[in-house]
């Protein structure tokens, strides 16, 4: 849908065909997250993380009614093996994540909450052996609504958008 919208805005002839309803297949099974790829830091894929973070920021700017910040917490417990090493590893990873996002001075950079502070926000969290938690931000979307808006935009820009239709053959 996004590609159809973008291509139609550029004046190209565009047709998008969907066999079922818009956003009913892959989109409906998504996690609804617009994330920067924090887990890819473990495999040193800095280019992918940087690109994903830039795309996330772009979506937050151009579609704030459909993409919004969402905070995540990673609780740390003393019984976790190598919990001091894990804390250091997470700290370095989140600092790198913030840096790649270009948010070293932003309100959305990561932070650490000690166990007492964390329990005031999450009173039902298991607190025995809780050391604290790192909090960081990514984003969430209403993906089906976003797809529908993109289809509407593509239509307005001159694209041919058809759903409940099956593509059989391209005739030249």
Label for each model-derived stretch:
Residues 2, 6, 35-36, 145, ...:
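Short amphipathic alpha-helical face segments that pack within enzyme cores
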Residues 8-30:
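Glycine-rich FAD pyrophosphate-binding loop
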Residues 134-172:
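Helical element adjacent to the flavin cofactor pocket in flavoenzyme catalytic cores
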Residues 122-128:
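Flexible hinge/switch segments at interdomain interfaces of large molecular machines
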Residues 84, 128-136:
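Conserved Rossmann-fold dehydrogenase catalytic segment
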Residues 4, 8-9, 153-155:
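Gly/Ala-rich phosphate-binding loop of Rossmann-like dinucleotide-binding domains
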Residues 32-121:
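Dinucleotide-binding Rossmann-like beta1-alpha1 core, especially the glycine-rich loop
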